[in-house]
Amino acid sequence: MSTVEERVKKIVCEQLGVKEGDVQLTSKFVEDLGADSLDTVELVMALEEEFETEIPDEEAEKITTVQDAIDYILANQ
């Protein structure tokens, strides 16, 4: 089983069409990885599906980096 970090990075790569080497823990989805608002919504939906959790909109707005996503998943598993 992959770690949460590996799974989050894989989803980010798939959703945003970026190379794994370009995805750092500090990478911001919009500024660093070129995501737009639709991309971020789809990214949150993919994370919800992968980790079988629900991320409320007010929490989703706070998830702006790869590390934010990992931290949220770990805190809410």
Swiss-Prot record:
GO BP term, example: lipid A biosynthetic process
Chief place of localization: cytoplasm
Subcellular location: Cytoplasm
Residues in coiled coil: none
Superkingdom to which the source organism belongs: Bacteria
UniProt KW keywords: Cytoplasm, Fatty acid biosynthesis, Fatty acid metabolism, Lipid biosynthesis, Lipid metabolism, Phosphopantetheine, Phosphoprotein
Post-translational modifications: 4'-phosphopantetheine is transferred from CoA to a specific serine of apo-ACP by AcpS. This modification is essential for activity because fatty acids are bound in thioester linkage to the sulfhydryl of the prosthetic group.
HAMAP family, per the entry: Acyl_carrier
Matching NCBIfam families: acyl_carrier, PRK00982.1-2, PRK00982.1-3, PRK00982.1-4, PRK00982.1-5
Entry protein name: Acyl carrier protein
Organism in which the protein naturally occurs: Hahella chejuensis (strain KCTC 2396)
Gene name of the record: acpP
